[in-house]
Amino acid sequence: GYMFPNYENTVSVVDIGTFREEGRIPVAVNLHHLLADSDGRLWVSSRGDYYGNTSALFCITDPAGTPQVQRITTQDGTDLVVENMTLRGDSMYVIGTEFSYATMQNHTNYGIVNVRTRQVLTTNFITDGTDASIMEPYGIAVHPHTGEILIGDARTHVNPGTLFCFSPEGLLLWKVRTGDIPAHFAFLYER
């Protein structure tokens, strides 16, 4: 996690019966999120160090046995910026904005990764240009039945945010003002 300048860089393997650490898997600096897919792979995001180590997404196969760590990049070798991520079926949706002190610029993406092939399908699933109005993509969820994509825009992190809803095709369906830093979602269903 965030321990500047000596960032931790490992995922711990814990025996659930004894709750003892059995090992550590080196991944990258400043780890942030961890998800498991339906095939037992772990997906880990790194925030990088805001200088030379960029934010990135990693896949760990066989985490309890002989773990292999793969950095997930686009076809041209570019890292995905990952502030938050969520799974729906074989698709991992990732959002993020990364600031670099080296370039003094932000880099933003709205990616989809096929978790079976570990291939980046797109770095911008928003297809209607609405991404230009999102200041700070912070939270993401995908409706399990409709495939609608929800993005929480934290904007300035001190003022009200915005919740955007996109169709599975990446078209804006609606948006609404929220409280500060919209990041988490829950779906309730009628019985």
Which role fits each region the language model picked out?
Residues 1-191:
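Predominantly soluble domains enriched in secretory-pathway, periplasmic, or organellar proteins
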